[in-house]
From Swiss-Prot:
Presence of keyword Disulfide bond: no
Reactions the enzyme catalyzes: Na(+)(in) + 2 H(+)(out) = Na(+)(out) + 2 H(+)(in)
One annotated GO biological process: regulation of pH
Protein name: Na(+)/H(+) antiporter NhaA
Biological function: Na(+)/H(+) antiporter that extrudes sodium in exchange for external protons.
Membrane topology according to the record: Multi-pass membrane protein
Signal peptide (residue range): none
Amino acid sequence: MTDRLTPRRAAPRQPALLPLADRCTALLSRLSHADAAGGIVLLIAAAAALAWANSPWAASYHALWHVPLSVAVGGWQLTQSLHFWVNDALMTVFFLVVGLEIRRELHDGVLAQPRDALLPVLAALGGVAVPALLYLALVPPALRSGWAVPTATDIAFAVGVLALLGRGLPPVLRVFLLTLAIIDDLVAVLIIALFYSGGLQWPMFGIAALGLAGVLLLQQLGVRRAWAYVPAGAVLWWGIWQTGAHPTLAGVVLGLVTPVHALAGREPAPPVQRVQASLHPWVTFGVMPLFALANAGVALGSAGGAQPAAPGTGLLMAAVAVALVAGKPLGVLLACWLAVRLRLCALPAGMGWGGLLLTGLLAGIGFTMAIFIATLAFDSAALLDAAKRGVLLASGLAALLGLAWGWWLQRRATTA
């Protein structure tokens, strides 16, 4: 995740007066402004998961995520595995930040002006359609449920790799990549809602609607304490889960209904800005690394207890990798070329086709969202592991290709 494209910061409070939680948030927020930091932490978590899952202690890695944890409120109790609480509960906070980003950009950001947003919107759609079609062309019908896996972009990794290239590239590249990635997130949310929420129990939407009504009522009453929204948000989450849809969609809903205007005389900044600023560092340095630790532990050989390859796993891994590494940049370039050719829009000032290829390569870093979609697409452990291996391979290749191409662009610019 990333901050808004042009963030407005409220005046900081004196550190000595801040509670411990606020001081931790302030520290993490300062770290998160270094774009590479989030990607580096995510990479460390993924590497730790891979090392653990392929070590002599691999059994303890898998056992950890199956440890049952219970949450009880009065006489009501919910017991699920630690893996569930990470993927289905904590990731709701990740999707809340996604919803907040989309809400802000729709209100007064790059998505508020259709003309400015048209090219990155088309680039994002091309970067979704081409990888999906390429994947479908490479796999047999039995594996087609994973078509959406190579459509996602990991903002933290992509922006982190771009930051490693330094300041020798035009600033417009970062803005374009961020805009493309935000739209990519929106498309991914729609894909999850429309294609990976089968067997919906429509009567249970009443419970979700009750939770949402509670959130909206608190807003109308002018309640601005975040903790006051937790019970209503929990009802919304539980209701969506009971419908058969993925419960993390509750985070997107909450983000999209967060107020964008501050109460006159009562708030220094709008709630959507304050909530995003508070949650962003915790998501970047807590939720996302924990998700990587819980999901990137794929056995690569006998040391990790890997089972004999099931039919189709090799093809699945290759299809995901090819669709991300080749399909993403091809889709981005093709969509933008058609848009320019048809005179629907023009390339941003200071951005050439080489820079556009760089954004396409970095968009091929799927990681977090791609692995998340894979967990929804495949019930078979063997197929899920193969899809994860494809995502990890593709993300590494896309990062290396992006670094190499970005370095070449910088060198060409300095020698021109």
